[in-house]
């Protein structure tokens, strides 16, 4: 899709821990397909994921580059399952802080409700519990999803509501 023909260029930052790699990849495919649908309406969505940043040494921490991209995005989407990685939490805080200052990015948190192998649970589950509590204390709405199809459906419903306003 040629984004030069689009009248609206929407930047979406996707944050999650590596445990949700499959969901991240499927979300990227979903955004690509949505672009094909939305292009006729003059909309192009650019998905920003950490995998697309170069690994070259940065003048600051590479995480600072991600945080800058978060602050310059229109929509921030974070996914959680059994842990909340420190960088994902940092990105959430940057997005939420920027939203409070400027009204952007719109912040979405999606929590996966799925089967967990008890043997795979580590102390990192506490990071998830602490983060979930933090989100609740902020009064931020979190969305539960069962699988990738459910996530895509819920996010598409949100896109249909917000894209005309962005």
Feature map (PLM): residue ranges:
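Amphipathic, non-transmembrane alpha-helical secondary structure
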Residues: 63-67, 71, 89, 93, ...
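Switch/connector loops and helix/strand junctions flanking conserved nucleotide-binding motifs
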Residues: 22-23, 56-57, 87, 116-122, ...
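C-terminal interaction surface of TIR/SEFIR-family domains
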Residues: 1-4, 113-166
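Conserved TIR/SEFIR loop-to-helix hotspot centered on a Trp-containing motif
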Residues: 58, 82-100
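Conserved N-terminal substructure of TIR/SEFIR domains
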Residues: 1-75, 79, 101-105
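A short helix->loop->beta-strand "cap" motif at the edges of active sites that frequently abuts
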Residues: 98-115
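Conserved beta-strand termini and adjacent loop/short-helix elements that scaffold enzyme active sites
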Residues: 48-52, 110, 145
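Generic recognition of short, well-ordered alpha-helical segments
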Residues: 25-26, 60-61, 90, 123-126
